[in-house]
Curated annotation (Swiss-Prot):
Annotated GO biological process: [2Fe-2S] cluster assembly; intracellular iron ion homeostasis; iron-sulfur cluster assembly; mitochondrial tRNA thio-modification; tRNA thio-modification; tRNA wobble uridine modification
Primary localisation category: mitochondrion
Organism listed in the record: Saccharomyces cerevisiae (strain ATCC 204508 / S288c) (Baker's yeast)
PROSITE patterns: AA_TRANSFER_CLASS_5 (PS00595)
Active site as annotated: C421
NCBIfam families per the UniProt record, alphabetical: IscS, PRK02948.1, PRK14012.1
Cofactor (UniProt): pyridoxal 5'-phosphate
Swiss-Prot/TrEMBL catalytic activity: (sulfur carrier)-H + L-cysteine = (sulfur carrier)-SH + L-alanine
Gene Ontology cellular component terms for the protein in this record: cytosol; iron-sulfur cluster assembly complex; L-cysteine desulfurase complex; mitochondrion; nucleus
pH-dependence of activity, as noted: Optimum pH is 8.5.
Chain positions with N6-(pyridoxal phosphate)lysine modification: K299
Listed name of the protein: Cysteine desulfurase, mitochondrial
Role noted for this protein: Catalyzes the removal of elemental sulfur from cysteine to produce alanine. It supplies the inorganic sulfur for iron-sulfur (Fe-S) clusters. Plays a role in both tRNA-processing and mitochondrial metabolism. Involved in the 2-thio-modification of both 5-carboxymethylaminomethyl-2-thiouridine in mitochondrial tRNAs and 5-methoxycarbonylmethyl-2-thiouridine (mcm5s2U) in cytoplasmic tRNAs.
Amino acid sequence: MLKSTATRSITRLSQVYNVPAATYRACLVSRRFYSPPAAGVKLDDNFSLETHTDIQAAAKAQASARASASGTTPDAVVASGSTAMSHAYQENTGFGTRPIYLDMQATTPTDPRVLDTMLKFYTGLYGNPHSNTHSYGWETNTAVENARAHVAKMINADPKEIIFTSGATESNNMVLKGVPRFYKKTKKHIITTRTEHKCVLEAARAMMKEGFEVTFLNVDDQGLIDLKELEDAIRPDTCLVSVMAVNNEIGVIQPIKEIGAICRKNKIYFHTDAAQAYGKIHIDVNEMNIDLLSISSHKIYGPKGIGAIYVRRRPRVRLEPLLSGGGQERGLRSGTLAPPLVAGFGEAARLMKKEFDNDQAHIKRLSDKLVKGLLSAEHTTLNGSPDHRYPGCVNVSFAYVEGESLLMALRDIALSSGSACTSASLEPSYVLHALGKDDALAHSSIRFGIGRFSTEEEVDYVVKAVSDRVKFLRELSPLWEMVQEGIDLNSIKWSGH
């Protein structure tokens, strides 16, 4: 008779430590079916904290009511992670009171329903999804494939076209390096734009060192590319066009469908970095002729450390993998997948599709209120196209105020002056430079990010706080004093000393 793994472990332990096997047997807990108390809280899909209400207290009460209806207690809901939704008012951290969070382009808070989905994969369902000889592997592999289907459904793709990665940076590198390397004997030219994310720009520059030529398209003062310039840049040896769908600093939405049509007509692969667009704007890879698309989980209220790349199968896109190994993910991305992250990513994608209309209406309403309030102050400018912009990303320049000074003055609000990936640099935004903004305006820009869990009272507070502190900082500025006196600063010949 075959012994179970647990029984064999008990026998070995009793022999090594000379302790009766019955002692270990009495303490044995079936790990496979163990579930911690917090993991047992199941939040109803309809729990949408700020989608249907603007007051966090009311939203918490709504969550508690739903938990009570499902047989749990309000305390259990709080323990399961609903306190994460009151992120603006948490105390007892190493940095004092938690500020209001309006930096959604950097990352989004994990939805409690996503966390709830992930927990069981840290306890009972811990099998390797690539182990196909026993139920531990079958269980997690089923969950992985279900998640893959949810990720694909959001963009009308085939699940087999979704390759899981560690995030959008890896996905972008796979494309910018993998496609040109595969076609390097006949195709030596890449086209991208000057306002792409740093990982795309750096990957393109890396390919220049390998002998490829890269054309960086300009954008107009609204942040949009010129389609005629794109067509003129295409050469017989062009292998790839990469254009970001939604810009991470100014939220501008590029004409993806038109770009896809141009690329398909010229038989060139079209890649779009959709880290800021996936689940937030309508994307159909077939309708838009997209061949490759990068996705990030933590931008859609999912876990960090997981992302995906869409790779078209018909017509088939070929690329060299960055990683060598066991040939997982159809040979394009070797390495053992993390089922908790993949499952969380899939649940986040499912919720984004399910709540798409409600989320968009909520974010648009708060964005309109924020923009109206911020632009009511004099000498403020909305950066990027007002007509082709994702509402959840608002980038405003406050003339005669240093952006870093304003950020420090707004310590009770979590904001940024540009991409989180380059926030350590004090250089003005290269994206705003590409729009033709001078150093002064580029330095004075602040990015506001609105998301699913943002509230109307937070927006009201932010508008008032920003207006008050901009006024205070301007009163300290000699340049502002000169402007108030009617002096044209552009007419002054500044000394170089």
